[in-house]
């Protein structure tokens, strides 16, 4: 079962990021900065990857059954306000689940997502490595000056 003691209210004040893999698809993703993640419903994940909701349900079930992810850790019942102004409780999945599903779905949008995720990860790793090397060099210079 989902982690429902973590009822997070998604409000208009949440940071919104627009992910647009191509001209025909754009998805607004609400960032939950307090938990360093994003939350999407199964339908939003299906829209993101250009597939149907039953495919997402199947992939999530396989991910949880295989032990790849723990359902209690990556899903939560969240409250959201619909267009009718009413608040509903809906099951949402965090970034870990979204990425795992993205690597299982076979669609053009999922392939675009995988390319994007790989590019972001490569940039992060390479820039992070570069920054760390610069910091180490600065530390060595500082240490050598202290020794003088």
Residue positions per predicted region:
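Short Lys/Arg-enriched helix C-cap and helix-to-coil transition segments
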Residues: 68-83
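Positively charged, aromatic-accented nucleic-acid-binding surfaces
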Residues: 1-53, 80-148
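Alpha-helical DNA-recognition elements
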Residues: 62-66
């Amino acid at each position: 079962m989902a982690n429902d003691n973590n009822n997070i209210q998604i409000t208009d004040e949440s940071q919104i990021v627009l992910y647009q893999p191509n001209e025909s698809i754009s998805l607004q993703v609400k960032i939950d900065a307090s938990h360093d993640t994003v939350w999407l419903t199964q339908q939003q994940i299906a829209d993101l990857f250009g597939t149907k909701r039953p495919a997402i349900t199947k992939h999530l079930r396989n991910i949880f059954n295989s032990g790849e992810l723990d359902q209690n850790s990556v899903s939560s019942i969240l409250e959201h306000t619909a267009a009718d102004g009413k608040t509903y409780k809906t099951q949402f999945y965090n970034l870990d689940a979204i990425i795992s599903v993205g690597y299982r779905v076979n669609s053009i949008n999922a392939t675009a997502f995988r390319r994007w995720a790989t590019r972001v990860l490569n940039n992060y790793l390479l820039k992070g490595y570069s920054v760390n090397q610069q910091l180490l060099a600065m530390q060595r210079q500082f240490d050598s000056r202290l020794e003088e």
